[in-house]
Amino acid sequence: MEEECRVLSIQSHVVRGYVGNRAATFPLQVLGFEVDAVNSVQFSNHTGYSHWKGQVLNSDELQELYDGLKLNHVNQYDYVLTGYTRDKSFLAMVVDIVQELKQQNPRLVYVCDPVMGDQRNGEGAMYVPDDLLPVYREKVVPVADIITPNQFEAELLTGRKIHSQEEALEVMDMLHSMGPDTVVITSSNLLSPRGSDYLMALGSQRTRAPDGSVVTQRIRMEMHKVDAVFVGTGDLFAAMLLAWTHKHPNNLKVACEKTVSAMHHVLQRTIKCAKAKSGEGVKPSPAQLELRMVQSKKDIESPEIVVQATVL
């Protein structure tokens, strides 16, 4: 019998579309993982639409759900995955749950996308309350094993600006020293060696050699920019990175190539379908730009490698 690998995913849920748990659960299941989803919010759709309705889970309600799992002795996990959170007390409760689960299973891996903000027109802007930053910096990152910040979030966490690849590598080393063994800066403003049509991502993984010494693998990836605003891509990225680092535990290069290549296929299919629906010269709507997840099942399962990572 194949060994079961179980993920506790604490993220947002939408009725229509693919963000948060909706973007993470399907790919993880396709790749063979059991996923237990806690929905931090339940909205009709993501907030990029003109309207949305729904409910938000508070920290007491999160505790209640977790207590239910505990009472039935079904709170054994191999992974915890978290993404967008707006509430400080909710985030602190997540940390408490992760710490308790790690006491039960010291090999548990916590994958955290520290969603706080992004760069718009060259200026960084936070889209969560400012009081979340110290919680991420002091409580979340120290218990995380894999983190997937964008450049702006990596700068916030370390207090260091990134203007070059060298500075990005230094920032990743600072993040390693805060706790996580694997750091992937999922997008940056750095100029790619391949030109301005490409988006650059960087990764760094620390592993222990049999003699106890620490080995660091650093990689760079360049992805062709797509002229559209997608929502849920970070959630999909973190979920697939979880899956592929599990399957290739000491090879960040291969794990990232598979993750980014699958992303490429999903986004290309999405933009093609969106343009076909919107018509020539018309900007696709948020509904038309929802990720074509189900249609991309084969690409998620066994992605054709179209993005090669460079080992630095």
Swiss-Prot record:
Residues that bind pyridoxal 5'-phosphate: S12, T47, Y127, G232, T233, G234, D235
Q: How is its activity regulated?
A: Activated by K(+). Activity is increased in the presence of Na(+).
**Where on this chain does pyridoxamine bind?**
S12, T47, D235
The biological processes this protein is annotated with in GO are: pyridoxal 5'-phosphate salvage
Gene3D superfamilies reported in the protein's UniProt record: 3.40.1190.20
Task: Recite the UniProt keywords alphabetically.
Answer: Acetylation, ATP-binding, Cytoplasm, Kinase, Magnesium, Metal-binding, Nucleotide-binding, Phosphoprotein, Potassium, Sodium, Transferase
> Sites of the modification N-acetylmethionine?
M1
> Does Ribonucleoprotein show up as a keyword for this record?
no
Report the pathway entry. Answer: Cofactor metabolism; pyridoxal 5'-phosphate salvage; pyridoxal 5'-phosphate from pyridoxal: step 1/1; Cofactor metabolism; pyridoxal 5'-phosphate salvage; pyridoxine 5'-phosphate from pyridoxine: step 1/1; Cofactor metabolism; pyridoxal 5'-phosphate salvage; pyridoxamine 5'-phosphate from pyridoxamine: step 1/1
In this chain, ADP is annotated as bound at: N150, T186, S187, M223, H224, K225, V226, T233, G234
Chain positions recorded as K(+) binding sites: D113, T148, T186
Please describe the organ and tissue distribution of this protein's expression.
Answer: Ubiquitous.
Reactions catalysed: pyridoxal + ATP = pyridoxal 5'-phosphate + ADP + H(+); pyridoxamine + ATP = pyridoxamine 5'-phosphate + ADP + H(+); pyridoxine + ATP = pyridoxine 5'-phosphate + ADP + H(+)
Q: What is its EC number?
A: 2.7.1.35
- Physiological role: Catalyzes the phosphorylation of the dietary vitamin B6 vitamers pyridoxal (PL), pyridoxine (PN) and pyridoxamine (PM) to form pyridoxal 5'-phosphate (PLP), pyridoxine 5'-phosphate (PNP) and pyridoxamine 5'-phosphate (PMP), respectively. PLP is the active form of vitamin B6, and acts as a cofactor for over 140 different enzymatic reactions.
Similarity section: Belongs to the pyridoxine kinase family.
How does it associate, per the subunit comment? Answer: Homodimer.
The protein, known as? Pyridoxal kinase
Q: Which gene encodes it?
A: PDXK
